[in-house]
């Protein structure tokens, strides 16, 4: 669930949402996460769960086979117009619940599954469904990268206040994110990040896979 009351309702409009994202530095943040965690390569399959207006596409290399879906018809309509003419980009209206029982072919064997700020809009049951869909979509060698807001045990009052302003009503603590992810994935790591954009927001990156992965600690730059 999310809070779209009052001024937050404006963010349901794609152009206002994108303008806000640019103001807070979300474009730079996505690029930094792409460089360090997504590591997508041309020709790979990417599934974007809760894709919004399709902003993540701009941070993927050319030639990626991309499928994104979202419950918002307004966001999907905007995404389709933005990437019209690119046969490698597909946008679908729907939720994880719509696809979990019968995964469409284009969503299978993904090298990368991305969730950019989706899970904190979902209750535990809905979030588990999204994580299970991500697991089902992954190729054996693939990996999931989810970027979310988080509460920390040691966190500045300003950061905690700012995270609490989020439209999503299910921002979780770091231990809660780990517990949730561990119900679906045996192999995952989490990384907390600050200074990713122009706000005091605290992020957590959840990187999960079907098989153990080994790489160095993230250097965000």
Residue ranges and their predicted role:
Residues 102-107, 138:
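Alpha-helix termini
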Residues 67, 108-109:
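Glycine-centered flexibility motif
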Residues 118:
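Hydrophobic adenine-recognition pocket in adenosine-nucleotide-binding enzymes
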Residues 43, 109-110:
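Local beta-strand N-terminus motif with an aromatic residue
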Residues 114:
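A conserved beta-strand element that flanks and buttresses the S-adenosyl-L-methionine
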Residues 1-43, 47, 52-103, 122-126, ...:
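Class I (Rossmann-like) S-adenosyl-L-methionine-dependent methyltransferase catalytic domain
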């Amino acid at each position: 669930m999310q809070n779209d009351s009052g001024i937050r309702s404006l963010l349901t409009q794609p152009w206002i949402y994108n303008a806000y994202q640019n103001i807070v530095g979300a474009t730079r943040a996505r690029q930094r996460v792409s460089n360090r965690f997504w590591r997508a390569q041309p020709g790979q399959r990417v599934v974007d769960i809760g894709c919004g207006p399709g902003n993540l596409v701009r941070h993927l290399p050319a030639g990626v086979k991309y499928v994104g879906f979202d419950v918002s018809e307004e966001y999907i309509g905007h995404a389709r117009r933005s990437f019209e003419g690119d046969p490698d980009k597909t946008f679908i209206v729907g939720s994880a619940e719509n696809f979990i029982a019968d995964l469409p072919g284009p969503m299978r064997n993904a090298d990368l599954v991305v969730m950019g700020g989706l899970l904190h809009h979902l209750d535990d049951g809905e979030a588990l469904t999204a994580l299970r869909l991500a697991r089902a979509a992954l190729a054996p060698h693939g990996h999931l990268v989810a970027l979310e807001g988080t509460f920390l045990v040691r966190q500045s009052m300003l950061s905690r206040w700012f995270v609490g302003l989020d439209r999503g009503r299910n921002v979780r603590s770091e231990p809660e994110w780990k517990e949730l992810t561990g119900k679906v994935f045996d192999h995952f790591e989490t990384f907390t990040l600050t200074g990713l954009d122009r706000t005091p927001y605290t992020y957590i990156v959840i990187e999960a896979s079907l098989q153990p992965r080994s790489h160095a600690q993230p250097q965000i730059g």
